[in-house]
UniProtKB/Swiss-Prot annotation:
Gene3D superfamilies: Phosphoenolpyruvate-binding domains. HAMAP family: PanB. Its EC number is 2.1.2.11. It is found in: Cytoplasm. Pathway: Cofactor biosynthesis; (R)-pantothenate biosynthesis; (R)-pantoate from 3-methyl-2-oxobutanoate: step 1/2. GO terms for molecular function: 3-methyl-2-oxobutanoate hydroxymethyltransferase activity; magnesium ion binding. It holds the Pfam family Pantoate_transf. Binds 1 Mg(2+) ion per subunit. The keyword Magnesium applies. The active site is at E187. It catalyses: 3-methyl-2-oxobutanoate + (6R)-5,10-methylene-5,6,7,8-tetrahydrofolate + H2O = 2-dehydropantoate + (6S)-5,6,7,8-tetrahydrofolate. It comes from Rhodopseudomonas palustris (strain ATCC BAA-98 / CGA009). This is 3-methyl-2-oxobutanoate hydroxymethyltransferase. Keywords: Cytoplasm, Magnesium, Metal-binding, Pantothenate biosynthesis, Transferase.
Length: 274
């Protein structure tokens, strides 16, 4: 006999239904503990392949593996109860064919129990998105600046800022929506373009360096907490935890070296005889 939880987790259809409504709040998380904190205030949690930068110190997200994403996705699911958890599909796990994408996405859903996957690309990935959604896998799209394409782009630069550069990005947005994605991340595009895309398509847009007019926003948690040395322009720091963490580590090191720690209150005495 199983005991059913009374806690209801948000789903992809819940997020889809927020189009044009209250803004969708989303942050990244890679650990159970931070997920439990983010879960209290956010509608969705993204287990982003940015974990390659944040956790592993990679310069790009390209080296991230499917196994890394599954491991951290499972941790975030264990730490959260309410938010929709979306796990990134890493570079090399979905581009070769629709079938490869399905097998990778199915592994993510089966092994993490998350509610959706996210993949990068617009027109070029539309058939893949449709293939997944038709087989019961909720997909969040990602257009504009696509970090997994860094070796093609050459640098992490905002998109759609030049005259005549909007059309391909608009086409990507339409393709993702028409393919059945329940929402789409719009990253680092000119603000008027982010606004136009939001008005143009029928699914929620989740902005990151796009526009306040988007249906929601997402940031990397460590960026907004002040733990990243050089965050992108679009990041607002809501905390400055770096100096506080450094001060705590410094204080610990000093007390260990001076033998001030552990103190009497931190050690165990002998039990008295009855």
């Amino acid at each position: 006999m199983s005991v059913q939880s009374t806690i209801r987790r948000k789903t992809a259809p819940d997020i889809r239904a927020r189009k044009g409504g209250d803004p969708i709040v989303m942050l990244t998380s890679y650990h159970a503990h931070t997920a439990s904190l983010v879960d209290r205030y956010c509608d969705a949690i993204l287990v982003g392949d940015s974990l390659g930068n944040v956790m592993h110190g990679f310069e790009t997200t390209v080296p991230v593996t499917l196994e890394m994403m599954i491991l951290q996705g499972h941790a975030v699911m264990r730490g959260s109860q309410h938010a929709l958890v979306v796990v990134d599909m890493p570079f090399g796990s979905y581009e070769a064919s629709k079938e490869q994408a399905f097998h990778s996405a199915a592994r993510i859903l089966k092994e993490t129990h998350c509610g959706a996957v996210k993949l990068e690309g617009g027109v070029r990935m539309a058939e893949t998105i449709a293939f997944l959604t038709e087989r019961g896998i909720p997909v969040m799209g990602h257009i504009g600046l696509t970090p997994q394409s860094i070796n093609t782009l050459g640098s992490f630069r905002a998109q759609g800022r030049e005259e005549g550069s909007w059309e391909p990005i608009e086409a990507d947005a339409r393709a993702v929506a028409d393919a059945g994605a329940f929402s789409v991340v719009v990253e680092a595009v000119a603000e008027p373009l982010g606004r136009k895309i939001t008005e143009m398509i029928s699914i929620p847009t989740i902005g990151i360096g796009a526009s306040a007019a988007c249906d929601g926003q997402v940031l990397v948690l460590e960026d907004m907490l002040g733990l990243s040395p050089k965050p992108p322009k679009f990041v607002k720091r809501y905390g400055d935890l770096g100096p506080g963490i450094e001060a705590a580590i410094k204080g610990y090191a000093e007390e260990v070296r001076s033998r001030a720690f552990p103190g009497p209150e931190h050690v165990y005495g002998m039990k008295s005889k009855a």
